[in-house]
Amino acid sequence: MKPDAHLVKQFLLNLQDTICQQLTAVDGAEFVEDSWQREAGGGGRSRVLRNGGVFEQAGVNFSHVHGDAMPASATAHRPELAGRSFEAMGVSLVVHPHNPYVPTSHANVRFFIAEKPGAEPVWWFGGGFDLTPFYGFEEDAIHWHRTARDLCLPFGEDVYPRYKKWCDEYFYLKHRNEQRGIGGLFFDDLNTPDFDHCFAFMQAVGKGYTNAYLPIVERRKTMAYGERERNFQLYRRGRYVEFNLVWDRGTLFGLQTGGRTESILMSMPPLVRWEYDYQPKDGSPEAALNEFIKVRDWV
């Protein structure tokens, strides 16, 4: 089957609806929708839930942008895209819970196609999901990674190990020599063996996110916590901000293509703190996080 951008767009809009419904069912609060248009072509639907029962902030964004020429960030490592019109669409979401024992989560699925007359279209899928705990629970990490592995298995034995490794490498803060969290899946430039296969995999990742995340939320959301845990959560959220502003290609692409800044930066936590030369106490649960987020085989 030829690449069908309309089919992908319909799936993405439905996925946004489904994920918002599932998060609302857990939290009780409703999302507020903000529809926007991009002057250069396209637009999107940003949905944000704030100060809910479980989630301090959850943002689920759909965007579909198109234009006559590619931005520098995209053509730098893909010169074949120069001189082509493009369409980029995706659903991207980040959930920042109140309770420090509930991890932050991020997921994204996207499709890109660039065309010019008389040439075959250049297209690919990308996406994944990753988990950023503040306090490590082995059973949560195992569930997260088993869910990721199980959704990958129908597409091949090598898919989960490959995309887990890519995720570990991508969500890494070089300037801190730290992983952002415990990873999950990350894939990009997926266009083989054919459109149908790649689209099916992207759908599996999009649908798999809540299966991986919501059982962890349910397990941890009522755990008692105090000021110490909250302070540590806010401190560790700083790493999230550092990664998104310094290393994340998606953030850079969005800002360079004249995307909607409010939507692009919706992934930012609502409250964060930095502390100069912070060192957790030896033997404390906070100190244990550094070991917990080191790359390992969870399944």
From Swiss-Prot:
Pathway: Porphyrin-containing compound metabolism; protoporphyrin-IX biosynthesis; protoporphyrinogen-IX from coproporphyrinogen-III (O2 route): step 1/1. One of its GO terms (molecular function) is manganese ion binding. Mn(2+) binds at H96, H106, H145, H175. The keyword S-adenosyl-L-methionine does not apply. It is found in: Cytoplasm. One of its GO terms (biological process) is protoporphyrinogen IX biosynthetic process. Substrate binds at S92, N108, V109, R110, G258, G259, R260. Pfam families: Coprogen_oxidas. One of its GO terms (cellular component) is cytoplasm. It comes from the Bacteria. Its EC number is 1.3.3.3. Keywords: Cytoplasm, Heme biosynthesis, Manganese, Metal-binding, Oxidoreductase, Porphyrin biosynthesis. Its cofactor is Mn(2+). It catalyses: coproporphyrinogen III + O2 + 2 H(+) = protoporphyrinogen IX + 2 CO2 + 2 H2O. PROSITE patterns: COPROGEN_OXIDASE (PS01021). InterPro entries: Coprogen_oxidase_aer, Coprogen_oxidase_aer_sf, Coprogen_oxidase_CS. The record marks H175 as: Important for dimerization. Its main location: cytoplasm. The keyword Magnesium does not apply. Residues 240-275 are annotated as: Important for dimerization. NCBIfam families: PRK05330.1. Homodimer. Involved in the heme biosynthesis. Catalyzes the aerobic oxidative decarboxylation of propionate groups of rings A and B of coproporphyrinogen-III to yield the vinyl groups in protoporphyrinogen-IX. This is Oxygen-dependent coproporphyrinogen-III oxidase. It comes from Escherichia coli O7:K1 (strain IAI39 / ExPEC).
